[in-house]
Regions:
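Short, charged beta-turn/beta-strand-edge "cap" motif at the junction between a beta-strand
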Residues: 161-166, 171
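Forkhead-associated
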Residues: 74-161
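Intrinsically disordered, low-complexity acidic Ser/Thr-rich regulatory segments
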Residues: 1-105, 169-181
Length: 181
């Protein structure tokens, strides 16, 4: 998983300034909302979630504001980008496997959990669950397997029980700018 931390990125923004920061961070980003002790362990096999756990994960509410959800220092930040040499250039894979474009080596994430895609003009983003064991939720609603669901700036996405906020490149830069003040 990424070693990028929100506060470190805020410091980088202060060093670079707005225009240079936006050039340096041209990709969508995920900010982890719920890192818990014991849940950051690297896992080889997928751990299953009970039906009650799935329901509880999908019932958790959206943050009141985008900045409320990102106030905790040290939050993990993941770049949503294609890794060099990765297959399937039309999508960005996310999963527990080390060779996933966005690697989440967490016990309740499938090896290939899902993927991000985008519209031809790059103005819209989508997430698709690849038939994972513990599901993907967008805004608290379970995503049907193999169905692309639109995501916009600030949308909460859960991969199994792990919650993230999705940011477009401009949305992420705006978030970091507001934190840098």
């Amino acid at each position: 998983m990424s070693d990028l931390r929100l506060e470190e990125i805020v410091q980088k923004y202060r060093q670079l300034g707005d225009a240079a920061f936006r050039n340096a961070y041209p990709h969508p980003m995920l900010v982890r909302r719920d890192a818990r002790d014991g849940e950051s362990e690297v896992a080889f096999h997928t751990a299953f979630m009970s039906r009650d756990m799935l329901r509880q994960t999908s019932e958790l509410g959206q943050p009141d504001t985008l900045t409320d959800a990102t106030r905790e220092p040290g939050q993990q930040v993941l770049k949503v980008a294609k890794r060099a040499g990765g297959p399937f250039q039309d999508r960005i894979g996310i999963g527990r496997a080390r060779n996933a474009d966005v690697s989440l080596p967490l016990p309740r994430v499938s090896k290939y959990h899902g993927y991000f895609s985008w519209s031809l003009d790059g103005s819209e983003y989508f997430v698709t669950d690849a038939g994972s064991k513990n599901g993907t939720s967008v805004g608290g609603s379970l995503v049907p397997a193999k169905q692309a669901v639109p995501v916009s700036n600030g949308t909460e996405i859960s991969f199994g029980p792990y919650r993230f906020l999705f940011y477009t490149p401009d949305g992420f830069a705006d978030l970091i700018a507001s934190r840098a003040r």
